[in-house]
Amino acid sequence: MWFSLFTPQRGDRLPEMLTPHERELAVAEMLLLRRAFPKLDMPEGLIRQFSTPPREPGECVFALTTQTVSADLKTRVVPCQFGGDPDCSACGCVASMALGAVAAHKWGGFIPVGSIFKASLKIGQLRAKPPAPLPAADEQLRILR
């Protein structure tokens, strides 16, 4: 079992939004719950990422490594799966936190995996070809009868 927290858009004032204090309480409770309930399959490092989410999509490993497409299979959703102008400082996406935990892990005990990822991303950007346009929906999804 995994948990996500609500991710608002910038400027939102909604009852689902957690205050910084409520967010820290949620992190503390998830840390306690994972010890009591083994089916809560969230490592401590992942849960702790909720305390320090990325500040912007350019810092989010999940946003940098995925391409989201809307239900019409044509429209790209940017900058991440939430689209629009997400308030990354209040991100509650479990996938973002999981990849953030991987990036924070130290390979060999001293090299942050995130540094390797960023170097790889830069090399890929330098060598990248322009992205191919998405095929028409009927070419991508064939309905069998």
Q: Where do the model's predicted regions map?
A:
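Flexible mid-to-C-terminal extensions adjoining Fe-S/redox cofactors in radical SAM and related proteins
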Residues: 57-61, 68-145
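Radical SAM enzyme [4Fe-4S]-AdoMet core and its adjacent flexible, acidic
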Residues: 1-62, 72, 104-108
